[in-house]
Regions:
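Glycoside hydrolase catalytic-domain groove-lining segments
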Residues: 325, 385-412
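Sec-dependent signal peptide recognition
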Residues: 2-9
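Short, surface-exposed loop/turn segments at beta-strand-coil junctions that are enriched for proline
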Residues: 67-69, 146-153
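Surface-exposed binding patches on compact interaction domains or structured appendages
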Residues: 21-44, 67-143
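C-terminal motif of bacterial Sec signal peptides marking the signal peptidase cleavage site
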Residues: 14-15
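Aromatic-lined carbohydrate-binding surfaces of glycoside hydrolases
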Residues: 130, 146, 157-164, 171-369, ...
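Short, solvent-exposed loop/turn segments enriched in Ser/Thr/Gly
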Residues: 44-46, 55-61, 139, 152-159
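Solvent-exposed, low-complexity, repeat-rich "mucin-like" stalks and linkers
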Residues: 48-72, 219-222, 226, 231
């Protein structure tokens, strides 16, 4: 009898078998609009064909999750091919979605706001293979397929594969994905799109994987070029550059001279990249204290060979002398070197009703030196004595002053 029980037990064990690597991994295509959180464990299957116009981007999202750690993950996509064997002349891009922790939620959130229990939200896409994922944590994978404007209409199919290791075992998971291209060509966007960026040493160090970058070195300029190319991909066409940061100054007996070579090189890089529909001049003033404090302009000064921006009241001798020379020089240089580039100058960011007086004083002084210069600003109030040429209100302030801003639009 014991032998019979033992035989039955062995039969049951052998029938169950050893679970394969694939059995321990959840791998699903999901809706690109689905927010996959770190703690997500249910992925509604999504097998839709993505529909796009020529000139548009098709996007796909996959999610992977396992009971054991995953290592050395790599994602690949084969060429998209239609039934006639014609391939889309594009290079699909893959990336692993990373997360950013939100320490404080927005007050008065929408009723349908999607909340992450961990407070980690998907944001950057890391276009680099070799990623690792801890056990029981979801990892979304993003695929972007640029469709050429001359693409032939029809349905194109490709295979997405995810390779990696779980424990000592390697695995490869595959899914077919498809794109339907309609006989419509998507025109280039005509919106004005700005994405502010910084090239200060601390920012460039982050971009360079934690390694220091000498300002204006060969590596620095290579990274600026990469940044310009990336902004082109994202349809940015308005670039913010700080004249005070990139222009060199020399003062002798109260008279200034200006070296525009680095500033011009920055402009040239973004101009060649095709992202310079308009140039924003970075802010020349800032708050002197807390949020409600008054504004004061910056005046450059060199200490031990390094440029330092020092704030002085607008009515001070230092500020008046510097900007009386700098603004006309800047305007004349831009007109001569870049006659086709639209230029708008920021004064100070987001003026409010508390610091209107100092903001208007600085803006009026700038206008007095160069009446043709355009002033652009993100603003919390429209009570700025009509000193702005380009108003950029936050949406809530746009709602409050809707009639005012509509009137500005009518006036051009």
């Amino acid at each position: 009898m014991k032998n019979l029980y033992l035989i039955c037990l062995l039969f049951i064990i052998s029938a169950c078998g050893t679970p394969t690597t694939e059995d321990r991994i959840t791998f699903s295509q999901v809706d690109p609009f689905l927010k996959v959180f770190r703690e997500s464990n249910f992925f509604p299957e999504y097998n839709e064909t993505e529909e796009v116009a020529a000139g548009e981007h098709a996007t796909f999202q996959f999610a992977v999750r396992a009971a054991l750690p995953l290592k050395e993950l790599s994602a690949q996509v084969t060429a998209f091919t239609n039934e006639k064997g014609t391939q889309l002349q594009s290079s699909p891009r893959t990336g692993f979605v990373d997360y950013v922790r939100v320490g404080r939620q927005t007050p008065d959130r929408a009723k349908d706001a999607i909340t992450s229990l961990s407070h980690y939200y998907p944001d950057p896409i890391i276009e680099q293979n070799g990623q690792s994922v801890t056990r029981d944590v979801a990892q979304p994978i993003w695929i972007s397929v640029p469709v050429p404007t001359n693409a032939e209409a029809g349905t194109y199919k490709a295979t997405f594969s995810l390779k990696g290791k779980m424990g000592n075992q390697t695995f490869e998971l595959k899914k077919e994905i498809s794109v339907k291209v309609y006989p419509i060509v998507m025109p280039q966007p005509d919106l004005w799109v700005t994405n502010w960026f910084g090239t200060s040493p601390d920012k460039m160090k982050i971009f360079n994987g934690g390694k220091e970058v000498e300002p204006y070195s060969d590596v620095y300029w290579e990274m600026v070029q990469e940044l310009a190319d990336k902004m082109k991909e994202c349809y940015s066409n308005v670039i913010l550059l700080s004249p005070l940061e990139h222009i060199e100054f020399e003062e002798k007996d109260g008279t200034y001279t200006f070296d525009y070579s680095r500033f011009d090189k920055m402009i040239d890089i973004f101009h060649r990249a095709g992202v310079l529909k308009m140039l924003e001049g970075g802010h020349i003033a800032g708050r002197t204290g807390d949020w409600s404090s008054q504004f004061a302009p910056y005046v450059p000064r060199y200490e031990n060979g390094k440029k330092k921006l020092v704030q002085y009241p607008m009515e001070s001798e230092q500020a008046v002398n510097f900007y009386r020379q700098f603004i006309p020089s800047l305007a004349a240089h831009l007109k001569e070197a870049y006659p086709k580039v639209l230029y708008a100058q920021h004064i100070a960011d987001e003026p409010t009703s508390d610091n209107i007086k100092s903001y208007v004083a600085i803006a009026r002084f700038v206008k007095q030196q160069c009446p043709d210069i355009k002033i652009i600003e993100a603003c919390h109030t429209h009570d700025l004595e009509n000193i702005l040429d380009i108003w950029v209100p936050q949406l809530n302030f746009y709602k409050e002053g809707y009639d005012f801003y509509r009137e500005r639009q009518k006036q051009g």
